[in-house]
A protein has these predicted regions:
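Acidic, metal/ion-coordinating pockets
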Residues: 1-251
Length: 251
């Protein structure tokens, strides 16, 4: 199937947004896939890479920015991160959350006159919390809105107490919205100090078909009103089919 097949009927929803942000769970490299030829459960079964054509596909499917701050972005080392950034740039897709200490970890974009800062918290890098807090402080004075994209927690279970403590600490530091990934299941949403926390959106395009929980995900349409300085949200559920296609969940 063509790459567009993977996105099913989500295209119109994605195209309607001013900016679509996604988590890219692995590097884009010229290397052959390791996990594809490995034994399920073996260590190398979790070494991911994407074909270079994926960068152009992301652009064609209206994904404008991707988060690189996750536990698979270094699967092919520094060279893998460098190739990923190059392929994304060539395709017109921006990125933030690089796991390399020498890179800038955040991105600020102007969206209809509102300066939006995208910051990453990656639980799986050294001093991830400290780096995220430093970035939040740095961008707080430059942006109208700070969105924190977190890669955190425990897979396949509800949000942990540790995640909830961290979320509050990040909001207290100046974050306006938290969007979480890594658990591969939808976790709860809560409001703290007037700020919304999505602990995990679950999967979007991923090959985990072994439970109802891993075949469910959320797209979140976040609309910011500069007059009130408040967000409103629409949760858009999606279903991952074992054909590899993701579709809007039928109501």
């Amino acid at each position: 199937e063509s790459g567009a097949f993977l996105f099913g009927n989500t295209g119109e929803t994605l195209a309607s947004a001013d900016l679509v942000i996604a988590n890219l769970e692995g590097p884009i490299t010229d290397h052959a896939s390791v996990s594809e030829t490995s034994v399920i459960g073996a260590r190398d079964n979790y070494v991911f890479t994407f074909d270079p054509s994926i960068a152009r596909l992301l652009h064609e499917e209206h994904i404008g920015v991707v988060n690189l701050g996750n536990n698979h972005s270094l699967n092919f080392g520094k060279e893998g991160v460098a190739r990923t950034k190059a392929y994304l740039t060539d395709a017109g897709v921006a990125y933030f959350g690089s796991p390399l200490s020498e890179d800038e970890h955040f991105l600020i974009r102007d969206i209809r006159g509102t300066r939006v800062a995208l910051v990453n918290y990656n639980e799986f890098v050294w001093q991830g919390k400290e780096k995220a807090l430093a970035d939040i402080v740095e961008v707080r004075g430059e942006a109208d809105v700070v969105i924190l994209y977190t890669h955190w927690g425990t897979e396949y279970v509800p949000a942990t107490d540790k995640m909830k403590r961290l979320a509050r600490e990040f909001v207290d530091a100046g974050v306006d919205l938290i969007i979480g990934s890594h658990p591969h299941v939808i976790q709860e949403t809560e409001v703290y100090q007037g700020k919304t926390i999505y602990y995990s959106l679950g999967n979007f395009i991923f090959d985990q078909y072994f439970s109802p929980e891993t075949t469910a995900g959320l797209l979140v349409r976040a609309t910011y009103d500069p007059a009130t300085e408040q967000f409103s949200f629409e949760d858009i559920p999606v279903t991952l089919k074992n054909t590899g296609q993701t579709v809007l969940t039928q109501k």
